[in-house]
Amino acid sequence: MNRDTICVQGGYTPGNGEPRQIPIIQSTTFKYATSEDMGKLFDLEADGYFYSRLQNPTCDMVAKKICELEGGTAAMLTSSGQAANFFALFNICEAGDHIVASSTIYGGTFNLISVTMAKMGITATFVDPLCTEEELNAAFRPNTKVVFGETIANPALTVLDIEKFAKAAHAHGVPLMVDNTFPTPVNCRPFEWGADIVTHSTTKYMDGHGAVLGGAIVDGGKFDWMAHAEKFPGLCTPDDSYHGITYAKRFGKEGAFITKATAQLMRDFGSVQSPMDAYMLNLGLESLHVRMQRHCANGMAVAQFLENHPKVAYVNYCGLESSPYHALAQKYLPNGSCGVVSFGLAGGRQAASTFMKELKLAAIETHVADARTCCLNPASSTHRQMNDEQLAAAGVPAELVRMSCGLESAEDLIADIAQALDKV
């Protein structure tokens, strides 16, 4: 089925006389006739629901739609994009393990991996996304368990060479995990290029209206956990906290990852999305394919205007032919990338501050990928916790402005940018 149709009708097919829109099952619990019936659910021997901290029908319908959009085999929703990335990483990493990650990932995820997970005994090596294959392979250690990157990095807007990173990951017997938030599956399906796990902050383009926090994890169902059983004991040996289930044996490579993340991590951490929020997310998904066209068109128009403005020192947007990532964008993102543009002003950080203050349509806010245009200075906000060396490695200089182009008229956006630049 075409992704446009999946956006509208995926995940839920109503039966005769059933609601056309997905139903909101706003209930914490579910009734069963016998304790034996419920016991089968607790033993993962039957399909169904017993407590919404783990699974809920509304959430599952929306997760199924996202799974279909990505071309995966199983998916789950979380309370935020950060929860999705943490669950996905912690689902296969434990104390003593190691992660290889792109250096240009979102500041919050960088902090999650480099600081919070380090407190759990999980270390990381960060690599330039444009590194050579030799440099990438040199980052691996015997205890490396996963490679992580973003299809389009936030806010440096670097493009991940998915095939290169997948090749290296698989050569070392580990999966490639890709955060596909910015392009969404409308513009890129990482599984088609070798990725194994995909994550999303559904708060961004999928919701698209700045209304609902959420995240998603999708399994491509191709990584053979049992073939590398010694690396992944959590999936390939009995889980003492769940009746001795061995997830990879019971559910195979198509379902083991999401089943473990749901039955074990969601049980223990509870970062679940509410049914009402899942319902609202679905409303956003229904128009995702249409909105992404406008976001991409506006992003390109703004990037082209900025590239030719004398007060702009540089522009990061992979759709521009001048971008060092243009060839990768043509390969992985032929139909467009996203509506986010980042750029630096010739006058430095103070010029960036003045520029943002003078904007009329674009609001200064810590958000991105909204219907309304917004901007911020990452070095003083989303990446504020990084030191100068880390900022440089992440592609986030002090003067950088990140602008998320919304659904307004491109002509109006450019006029607003022009008048603000005139005052710098």
Each predicted region: which residue ranges?
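PLP-dependent enzyme catalytic core of the Aspartate aminotransferase-like
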Residues: 1, 114, 123-124, 138, ...
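Conserved PLP-enzyme active-site core in the AAT-like
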Residues: 7-13, 75-308
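Short loop segments at secondary-structure junctions
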Residues: 29, 220-223, 345-348
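Conserved N-terminal alpha-helix of the aminotransferase class I/II PLP-enzyme fold
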Residues: 34-86, 108-116
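Glycine-centered tight turns that cap/initiate beta-strands
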Residues: 71, 143, 311-314, 399
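Short hydrophobic/aromatic beta-strand micro-patches
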Residues: 218, 342-344, 404-406
